Amino acid sequence: MRRPSTLTVMRWELRKLRSQKRTYLGVGIAVIFPLIFVLAQNLNQHHHGGGADNIYLAHITESGLATPVLTLLFESAFLLPLMALLVAGDIVATEDGNGTLKTILTRSVDRGQVLAAKVGAAALYTIVGLFLSATVATVAGVASWGFNHVTTFSGTIVSAPRGLLLVIAAYGFFLIPLLSVMSIGVLLSTITRNSAAAVVGALGVTLVLALVTVIPGTSSIQPYLLTTEYNNWHGLLRTPTDWAPIWHSAWVCALYAVPSLIAAYLVFLRRDVAGG
């Protein structure tokens, strides 16, 4: 019997994701928040003449391109990691717990292929969810405040087309720490056989890392904490572009993602699924 390709196995995984409620819950969280944000700012503008008294919202009405940047600032700490983990934490645990992994492994598919397909499906879901959030935020912002020039974090005014490219780049770069969080979720999903434990556990890890940053005396390790990397995309929105935090974040995130995926593979390789 011919062994199916990893891409074929990944298509199986994507079909399963389409039938699961948590798939749509995660995307819904990522998409609804920008709409609520834009609605709130429109109401604020209508009743109070805008948000000039707020450091984050002072320029929001100047250009709709400020909206996806501001929503990324707010969503990056919790909502977007939660979106990624709702699937990553479930991707192995549910089938393992239900005893259906052994059915997949009897289709002449080796374990490495199965895990690679699951990681690929979780990664694709994370990418699609993130850019759906970006698209909704951009469209809603532009519809409310126009496709105008935008002010960078350095105070430099850039044209609307360049501003749009910077927004895309910012979201693209945020994928690096987000995929690292996803990798931790896959690892815990593989270890625990319990979706809730994997999701809560991975969120707990990120929460602990975030809390470490506010503990006095931890400044020397803060540059190496995953949650610190959530904000390093800010360097793309400065003039000139500050590449130092970008490259630093890339290799720091790799230190979290690569060992997590290797450990997940080793655990999955040795997992006894014969009894369910």
For each feature predicted by the language model, list its residue ranges.
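Alpha-helix N-cap/helix-start motif at helix boundaries, enriched for small hydrophobics
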Residues: 113-115, 268
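Alpha-helical transmembrane segments of multi-pass membrane transporters/translocases
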Residues: 2-3, 7, 237-276
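Aromatic- and glycine-rich beta-strand/loop motifs that create alpha-glucan
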Residues: 1-31
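Secretory targeting signals
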Residues: 31-86, 116-182, 186, 233-252
